[in-house]
């Protein structure tokens, strides 16, 4: 409790209570000091409640009682749930005052200021700087622009506010390839002629926005490339450079095909006004670029065939582009004629589409009817095939019977011998099957039992796995809660004042925890020893009862015949009774000793409550009240 009292005294001093250095525990608090500390804490917790209370005890007893009742009501208003009254402040005891001060100290608001020599992280320092800047700006009153002083124009004017306008930047460091693979001219340009980043945008205010936009674009491009490489590039079994070259070649071919398709003459675009000279030049450049030997260095037979198919000679490509350009329609027809022609073609195509739809519906109906008829014919064919097979079997049997009729007697004898041999074979096979069936049945039963055991084991393991998953989920939730609680406590710890070193408190807490562990081990050892003794006592008691019962039975048989045996039986009964009384006396003695220890603890607790000193105070206050009453009565008589 000494460490707790020191923490409470330090907190009360921070709240504004004037506590002497000699006071080291709550036990040394006087009534005046208790009242002052409670009022100071109430003023910090709730100024509306504490400002109306006096922090010093008045000289009159009635005023003291009223102040004590007011303090008790104020403590209940701020949330104190324990028993409290005027006696708590005027005739206090140590446990009640300690619990009251602990409640008030917990309700005190946390201080936001920290010691300047306390180490903190970069994020914490940044947050503090931002908070201090915002607080300083909010503390400055707003003034019209014409009334602002030069010191306030920088923070209150709208000059620093700019729109987010990003411009493209040229950054050599942002390239993924190294500078060794770049030409010397490019490196010389970067080294001698490339402007700094701050000078590239047209306005200085666009520099942060441009840098942020460039960083975001590089980051998104890197993330997209990583996701594409993980999803598609790894499956291609190529190096990143080969995959990029293949992708570049595919894109060039696709663009070339799209442009070639767009450049081909169409019958529905005669008279359209457009030129294909630029398109032909672009296709020529694509054709020339695609003939390079560094695009596809490796690949399968399909890729080489594709390269051979789509790679053309430059002269042939130029001739094709010239033919396509000459085949393009002229620009004599107006736009209105073109629109009318397109509408007419559209209506004609719609009519053709409707006719084709009707024809498709008719053909579909015919196909359905033919399908149904084919199914019926197929079923009938299958039925006739089954009937023909049955008839063929019957004809075959009858033909064999007719063949046997000329020599009927010999054939009957042969059939009988064949039937007998078949029956014997059936009996033999049945006996053999019975021999094989018994071990198979046993094996089947064993496997079935094993399967059931495995199913029960698997179901048990499945339930254990489910329980384990539930425990893992609960542990994860508990870990999240503890993590959030840890962050909250960490923020509260960072906001605490660091005037007092907490290393001593930490060491003391660790010592208390160690002592508690030692006490727990000792208590566990005592409990185990007590259980062992109780088991031993129970065993000896049972053994004694059984021995006495056997001895009593043996002696009682011979007691009727021999006088000495009768006396021995009486002595045995008396000894058993005396032993029982002795055991009961020992148990009663232990109970009395335990009650004595409980009473001693209660006496120590009552002595800690300062009952005698409180009674003396009450007697003194009673005498003071009688004196005040007598003085008031004398004044009334004189008046």
Curated annotation (Swiss-Prot):
Coiled coil: 331-370, 459-541, 591-638
BP GO terms, sorted: positive regulation of ubiquitin-dependent protein catabolic process; protein transport
InterPro entries from the UniProt entry: CCDC22 (IPR008530), CCDC22_CC (IPR048348), CCDC22_N (IPR048349)
Key word Protein transport present: yes
Keywords: Coiled coil, Cytoplasm, Cytoskeleton, Endosome, Protein transport, Transport, Ubl conjugation pathway
Places the protein is found: Endosome; Cytoplasm, Cytoskeleton, Microtubule organizing center, Centrosome
Disulfide bond positions: none
Gene Ontology CC terms: centrosome; endosome
Recorded GO MF terms: cullin family protein binding
Family from the record: Belongs to the CCDC22 family.
Role: May be involved in regulation of NF-kappa-B signaling. May be involved in copper-dependent atp7a trafficking between the trans-Golgi network and vesicles in the cell periphery.
Protein name: Coiled-coil domain-containing protein 22
Organism: Danio rerio
């Amino acid at each position: 409790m000494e460490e707790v009292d020191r923490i409470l005294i330090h907190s009360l001093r921070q709240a504004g209570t004037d506590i002497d250095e000699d006071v080291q525990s709550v036990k040394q608090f006087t009534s005046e000091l208790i009242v002052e500390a409670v009022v100071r804490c109430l003023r910090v917790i709730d100024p509306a409640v504490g400002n109306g209370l006096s922090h010093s005890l008045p000289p009159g007893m009635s005023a003291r009682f009223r102040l004590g009742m007011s303090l008790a009501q104020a403590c209940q208003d701020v949330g104190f749930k324990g028993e409290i009254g005027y006696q708590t402040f005027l005739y206090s005891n140590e446990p009640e005052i300690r619990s009251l001060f602990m409640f008030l100290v917990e309700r005190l608001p946390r201080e936001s200021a920290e010691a300047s020599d306390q180490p903190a992280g970069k994020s914490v320092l940044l947050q503090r700087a931002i908070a201090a800047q915002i607080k300083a700006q909010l503390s400055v009153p707003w003034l019209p622009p014409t009334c602002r002083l030069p010191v306030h124009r920088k923070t209150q004017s709208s000059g620093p506010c700019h729109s987010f306008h990003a411009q493209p930047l040229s950054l050599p460091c942002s390239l993924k390839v190294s500078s060794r693979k770049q030409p010397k001219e490019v490196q010389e340009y970067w080294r001698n002629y490339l402007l700094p980043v701050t000078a590239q945008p047209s306005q200085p205010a666009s520099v942060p926005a441009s840098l942020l936009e460039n960083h975001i674009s590089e980051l998104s491009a890197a993330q997209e490339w990583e996701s594409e490489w993980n999803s598609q590039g790894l499956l291609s079994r190529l190096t990143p450079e080969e995959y990029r070259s293949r992708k570049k070649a595919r894109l060039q071919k696709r663009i070339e095909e799209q442009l070639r398709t767009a450049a081909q003459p169409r019958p529905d675009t005669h008279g359209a006004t457009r030129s294909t000279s630029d398109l032909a030049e672009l296709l020529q450049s694509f054709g020339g670029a695609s003939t390079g030997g560094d695009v596809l260095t490796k690949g399968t037979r399909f890729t080489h065939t594709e390269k051979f198919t789509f790679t053309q000679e430059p002269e042939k490509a130029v001739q094709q582009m010239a033919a396509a350009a000459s085949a393009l329609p002229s620009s004599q027809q107006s736009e209105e004629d073109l629109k009318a022609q397109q509408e007419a073609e559209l209506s004609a195509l719609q009519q053709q589409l409707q006719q084709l739809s009707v024809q498709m519906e008719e053909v579909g109906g015919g196909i359905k009817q033919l399908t149904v008829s084919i199914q019926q014919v197929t079923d009938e064919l299958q039925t006739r095939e089954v009937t023909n097979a049955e008839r063929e079997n019957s004809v075959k049997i009858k033909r064999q019977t007719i063949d046997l009729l000329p020599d009927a007697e010999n054939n009957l004898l042969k059939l009988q011998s064949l039937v007998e041999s078949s029956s014997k074979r059936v009996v033999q096979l049945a006996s053999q099957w019975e021999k094989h069936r018994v071990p198979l049945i046993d094996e089947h039963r064993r496997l079935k039992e094993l399967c059931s055991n495995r199913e029960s084991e698997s179901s048990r393991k499945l339930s254990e796995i489910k329980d384990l998953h539930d425990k893992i989920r609960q542990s994860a939730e508990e870990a999240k809660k503890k993590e959030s609680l840890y962050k909250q406590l960490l923020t509260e710890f960072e906001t605490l004042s660091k005037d007092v070193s907490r290393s001593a408190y930490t060491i003391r807490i660790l010592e208390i925890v160690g002592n508690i562990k030692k006490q727990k081990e000792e208590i566990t050892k005592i409990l185990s020893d007590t259980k062992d003794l109780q088991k031993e006592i129970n065993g000896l008691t049972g053994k004694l009862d059984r021995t006495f019962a056997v001895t009593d039975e043996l002696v009682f048989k011979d007691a009727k015949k021999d006088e000495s045996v009768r006396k021995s039986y009486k002595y045995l009964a008396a000894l058993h009774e005396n032993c029982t009384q002795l055991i009961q006396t020992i148990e009663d003695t232990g109970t009395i000793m335990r009650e004595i220890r409980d009473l001693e603890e209660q006496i120590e607790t009552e002595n800690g409550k300062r009952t005698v000193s409180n009674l003396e105070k009450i007697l003194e206050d009673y005498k003071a009240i009688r004196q005040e009453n007598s003085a008031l009565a004398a004044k009334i008589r004189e008046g």
